[in-house]
Amino acid sequence: MFASVCGKTPCDEGAAFVADTAVVVGDVTLKPGCTVWYGAVIRGDEGPIVIGENTNVQDNAVLHCDPGGQITLGRDVTIGHGAIVHGAEVGEGSLVGMHATLLNGCKVGRHCIIGAGALVPEGKVIPDGTVAVGVPARVVKDAAEAQTAAAGYNAIAYVNLGREHAAAIPLESAKSEE
């Protein structure tokens, strides 16, 4: 569902797929090739949200910020299932694991991996090319080239999968065509 709220309207610049059960409201910009999956909520009612090119916001993720805050997701980012991004910035090619939480003002660098279930506290900076895990999240190592390549592959795989879902035929329609 796309909706205007607080005088702000989402801008779709060519998303590959936005699920019919996703909610995209307010000051949200969807860049070309991005995908927003089932049950995801992207609320740009309090501040602007930009979803980068080929970035995927997976099922049941929530993106929102406090008044005056903003969210910027770079190109080729993966926001895992059930993750929460609240007023944060995520750099190009990074992966935020399932059920991870990013709090206000934190910055995740380029080509980073945030482990599943991690909590990145307010204002924390995760340097480029690192892996951070835990509660609170701490950097444990440099991201191996294979890990960052896999994160990039994941982003492209979700663009392609999104196109498949966008072309899907609902079962009721398929049955009536028989």
List where the protein language model places each region.
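Glycine-rich hexapeptide-repeat left-handed beta-helix
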Residues: 1-12, 17, 45-48, 53, ...
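A cytosolic small-molecule/anion-sensing beta-strand core signal
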Residues: 20, 32, 53
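N-terminal glycine-rich anion-binding loops that anchor highly charged ligand groups
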Residues: 25-31
